[in-house]
């Protein structure tokens, strides 16, 4: 949803005869549809480690922490990966590649398991709203932060080096190149 506005209008103007069907799917659905021939190509966080899928890296997108005002790290200008407690981070639900990226770079610093509740959402908007209610912090892909309102942008904290980022690639079946 954050990438489309950057190119879709120009693409449609330049290639008016191309039939373009755009769907927002989680990573598991993308892999399944690519493998069964119901999807020609997709853009997803990689690497996927899928033998039947070809990946062409498009860019690397940094993670940005969303830290609400009441949180202990709110007054920091930049944060470090070691500042994160995986048990305080509100995550996307299973099947989303961004969730897996967050879990991968936080796994070494996981403290104790969250005992009072566990939340997994399907949207970044829900995660932001819940963070604002004091239920934790969340991490966002950089492109998603560009559309936040000015008040929410004040709650963004960039990471010190090494900055966590995700690899984003064009993916398609190796067996048949349709693009």
Give names to the regions the model predicted.
Residues 1-15, 19-24, 28-32, 100-101, ...:
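N-terminal winged-helix
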Residues 18-26, 45-46, 113-123:
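Short beta-strand-to-loop elements that line the ligand-binding cleft
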Residues 28, 46-53, 100, 104, ...:
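A ligand-binding cleft/hinge motif common to bilobed small-molecule-binding domains
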Residues 3, 155-179:
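A late-sequence structural motif
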Residues 6-10, 21, 27-63, 67, ...:
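Short beta-strand-centered segments that line the small-molecule binding cleft or hinge
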Residues 88-110, 179:
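Secondary-structure junction motif
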Residues 52-89, 174:
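Flexible hinge/capping segments at coil-to-helix
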Residues 46-47, 69, 95, 141-144, ...:
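Short secondary-structure boundary segments
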